[in-house]
Structure formats: C-alpha cells, structure tokens
Curated annotation (Swiss-Prot):
Main location: cytoplasm
Lineage: Bacteria, Pseudomonadati, Bacteroidota, Bacteroidia, Bacteroidales
SMART domains: Alpha-L-AF_C
GO molecular function, one term: alpha-L-arabinofuranosidase activity
Pfam families attached to this UniProt entry: Alpha-L-AF_C
Protein function: Involved in the degradation of arabinan and is a key enzyme in the complete degradation of the plant cell wall. Catalyzes the cleavage of terminal alpha-L-arabinofuranosyl residues in different hemicellulosic homopolysaccharides (branched and debranched arabinans) and heteropolysaccharides (arabinoxylans).
Full protein name: Intracellular exo-alpha-L-arabinofuranosidase
Gene source species: Bacteroides ovatus
UniProt-listed GO biological process terms: arabinan catabolic process; L-arabinose metabolic process
Keyword Cytoplasm on entry: yes
Marked site: Important for substrate recognition: W321, Q366
Length: 514
C-alpha cells in the first residue's frame, strides 16, 4: 500500500512508500555546543572563466539587461537574498596570469588579454579591482583577493595591496584616488598565489614555501587594515604539501588553503551533469563525503605543528565538476545543476560544520555559470539552481553554534569501496537560542522515519522547508525554472522532547524549533 505526501509547489511531489519506510535515530546535544560555524563556510568564488563574470555578475552600465551600476540586477538581488559572507576573486588559475593594473582606470584604455587557462577567450579587463571591491561592499560581504605569484612580481603584489588598502599620501593610494576612489577599501583575506603546485607555477612545496615567505613579507598592513594572509595549499590527497608548508612557513601564514572537487577524474570524460543512473548518484555521494577523511588528515598534520589551531584551514575550492553542457564552449565549464548537486552541497556542508575548530572558510566553485553554481544566466534570463536553494535553506547556520549530534541509520556500500549513510544531519543554535536542524535523506527510493531526541529542549513545534523533486536528474532550466524549489514542510511532530520526522526519499529539509 502506498500513500503520497504532496508538497505544495509546482512540479514537486514525493511518493512515500509507507510499507518500506526506513528509520533513523538522532540525538542532538543542545547543551554541548562549543564551536561557532563561521559564516565564511558559506563562501563563494568568482573567476574570470566562461560567463561567470561577463554576462553572469557583470554586464556593464550601458547594457540593455537591467543592472545596478553594471551588475546584473537579477543576479545581485538573488545573491543579496543568499547572505553571501565572502567572495573569492579573480581566480583560480586566472589569478596567476592576472595583472591588476590592466584592470584599473578608464575602461576604454584597459588592455585586452587572452585567457589562456579557460578557452582562449579575450578578456577586456572591464571588470577589475574597483568593480570587484565595490560589488563586495554592495553585497555586504568580505572580499578575498588571490594575488599573482605564478607570473607576477613581488613589487606588483605589494603595490596592489597598497592600492586597495592605503589611505596615506602614497603613490598607489593617489593612483586609486585618480581613478575615482578616495577612501581605501577594507581587505581582510589575501591569497598569496593559487594552486602553486599546478596552474599557479608547477612548483615543489619547498620552493613555494620560500616564495610565500618572500611575497608575503611585502604585503603590508596599511592604516589599520589587517591582512589575513593565505598560503596556496594542497589538492585533495597531497598531504606532503601541507606538511612542508606547516614546517617551513608556519605562523608566517594566517591560513592554508585546500581544494577538493567531487569529480570522477582529471582525464577523459567526467560524466554528464544531467544524464546519470542511481549507481552514478550513489558514487557521487561517496566521493563528496570522502572530503571528511581528507579534512581529518590535513587537520592532523596541521595539529602537529600548530596545536593551538592558530592557522586556519580554508577549503577555498570545492563542489562538483562534470562535463560541459553540449553545445557550450569548451573550457568555459558551464554545467547544469540537478538534485544530485543539491545533495553534494548539503552533505558537504554537514561535514564542514564538524571541523570548524580548524576549518574557517569554504568557497564553492563557482558563483554563476561555472561548475556547481548558484545561478545560471542566458542573455536576459536567470535561473536559480538546486544548490542555490540548499545554501539559502542552510544560511540559518551561519555564525550559529554547532551542536554535536549522534546519528544511527542504514548505510550502503557503493562503487570504489566507499560507504554512504542514508541520512545526513547537522544542527546549530543561533545567538537568540533558536535551534535549526537540517536533514538529508540520501536514499533515492525510500522514505525515512527519523526519531530525534532533543533532550531538555523546550520546543513544542517545528516549521521547515523541503527540497526534493520527482527524479534525481531534475534541474531548473530557463524554460522550466521551478522544477526543483523549496516548499513548506509539515511532516514533523514533537512530544516530550522527541521529534518525529517523515522524510521523503531524496529530500533535504531544514527545520526551526519553536
């Protein structure tokens, strides 16, 4: 016998098989919260790549696409709703070929360049330092600037820092004033190179460690601005890189980056973003969850040199990486975004919350039109992705206190000797004492009856939202933009400190206890 739970949103229905319903138990330790979930865990990343900047964030003041000082109005408003905490720019691989002085001054005088990393397209530099930092001010987010170590000089990076942050009577501050900005910007996060083991210079960690020490020496703090200097860190399983940097750079850096992509491999096809089967889906869940083991191992190395955890770990590139959509430009990394990607987002964020004693920032790749993006655009049209909605549902956890949980559920063995729990969860308490719980039912076919022990919590009811779809392969298109969209969720009851949640198959829910 089957019953259907209808969720009130267009194109959204989840069939719940009551006879085959599975169960899971969770205990929320509401009295044991210690670590704050930094809002920067919900960071974004924008690179000069494909249509991320041009046509995505920026169309220029003279465009017939509605804009605010050149920034797309629809995209800007969607990002404001997301409460973006930090935005990384200009790359990525582009950062180590970017020469910042080409992107200042009158736009008609800015030289063009070939974007050799990403499709060989022409970069006109109309979006530069002023455009980026002004956007961050308008969004109310922290800028994170990645400096050029691969092909740039120490002097070039030093002058860029002075240009952005000095309020004195200095050459670069006066040049900034000449270009229309009197007051210096506040810049906290400065990356000293990017992927220096690869596109950022193909360096050995020992060599890069010396370069970091040299370049960072001349990145000075001007007029009360305090830089948080970030060294270029490892790619996923390269634990030697982290060991060498911690040993040879140590507390000369404030943070060390790490990159981890949910990708099938770096040669040949990476698979379609929209055409996949359940085996592919479960493999993806296993691969994305492997980030926990990667984080543990890098953190253990860092603990060896920094027991007090003064040096932050920053996962400043993460997310899914599929083949480009058919008919799009090779090298522009434009991919669709399905319910599968939404689960990669929710499961990854659940993991990140557990390691915030060391992990202080994460930046999903990328914000618009590239890889696992929040937003897709085409000419005047815009669509919000399933990943966008996960970030919006989860933003209640920003700067909240992480609450430890115990979770018991069924697990599945998947390809490549990985094991995937069928339920993922995270919980937090905000500054007003309100508890939020996010739940993911990874099972593609069967519902979960989840019993949550709330302890001494006085909650009497819960309200929430659910994100699901008819199929794992469902996505939002320009023709049908609301296929995967949150809807109110009411399948929850609380009685004497115990909460019962009926979680449909392949669904993500965030609850607020009241």
């Amino acid at each position: 016998m089957k019953a259907k739970l209808l969720v009130s949103t267009a194109f959204l229905a989840a069939s719940v098989s009551l006879s085959a319903q599975k169960s899971a138990t969770i205990t929320v330790h509401a009295d044991q919260g210690k670590e704050i979930i930094p809002k920067e865990i919900y960071g974004q990343f924008a690179e000069h790549l494909g249509s991320c900047i041009y046509g995505g964030l920026w169309v220029g003041e003279n465009s017939d696409i509605p804009n605010i000082k050149g920034y797309r109005t629809d995209v800007f408003n969607a990002l404001k709703d997301l409460s973006v905490p930090v935005l990384r720019w200009p790359g990525g691989c582009f950062a180590d070929e970017y020469h910042w002085m080409d992107g200042i001054g009158p736009k008609e005088n800015r030289p063009k360049m070939v974007n050799n990393n990403w499709g060989g397209t022409i970069e006109d530099n109309s979006f530069g330092t002023h455009e980026f930092l002004n956007l961050c001010e308008m969004l109310g987010c922290e800028p994170y600037v990645s400096g050029n170590v691969g092909s740039g000089t120490v002097e070039e990076l030093a002058k860029w820092v002075e240009y952005m942050t000095s309020d004195g009577d200095s050459p670069m501050a006066n040049l900034r004033r000449k270009n229309g900005r009197d007051k210096a910007w506040k810049l906290k996060y400065l990356g000293v190179g990017n992927e220096s083991w690869g596109c950022g210079g193909s360096m050995r960690p020992e060599y890069y460690a010396d370069l970091y020490r040299r370049y960072s020496t001349y990145c000075r703090n001007y007029d009360g601005n305090r830089l948080f200097k970030i060294a270029s860190g490892a790619s996923d399983y390269d634990y030697k890189w982290t060991d060498v940097l911690m040993n040879r750079v140590g507390h000369r850096m404030d943070g060390l980056s790490l990159h981890y992509y949910t990708v099938t491999g770096w040669s040949g096809s990476k698979g379609s973003a929209t055409q996949f089967n359940k085996d592919d889906y479960y493999w993806t869940m296993g691969k994305c969850l492997e980030v926990e083991d990667v984080l543990k191992k890098h953190c253990t190395i860092m603990d060896k040199y920094d027991k007090d955890k003064k040096i932050a770990l920053l996962l400043d590139e993460w997310g899914t990486w599929w083949d480009e959509e058919p008919g799009t430009i090779k090298g522009h990394l434009y991919q669709q975004n399905t319910l599968r990607d939404a689960f990669v987002a929710s499961l990854s964020l659940d993991v990140f919350h557990k390691y915030t004693d060391r992990l202080k920032m994460a930046n999903i790749a990328q914000i618009v039109n590239v890889l696992q993006s929040m937003i897709l655009t085409k000419d005047k049209e815009m669509v919000l992705t399933p990943t966008y909605y996960v970030f919006k549902m989860y933003k209640v956890h920003q700067d909240a206190t992480y609450l430890p949980i115990d979770l018991t559920c069924e697990k599945m063995s998947v390809r490549d000797n990985r094991t995937v729990p069928m339920v993922s969860a995270t919980a937090s308490k905000n500054k007003d004492g309100v508890i939020h719980i996010s739940l993911s039912n990874v099972d593609a076919d069967e519902a979960q009856e989840i019993t949550i022990n709330l302890g001494d919590t006085k909650a009497k009811k819960a309200i929430g939202e659910i994100l699901t779809a008819s199929k794992l392969t469902d996505y939002n298109s320009f023709e049908k933009p609301n296929i995967v969209k949150p809807a109110p969720f009411k399948e929850v009851k609380i009685n004497k400190g115990t909460m019962k949640v009926k979680l449909p198959a392949k669904s993500i829910v965030t609850l607020e206890l009241q």
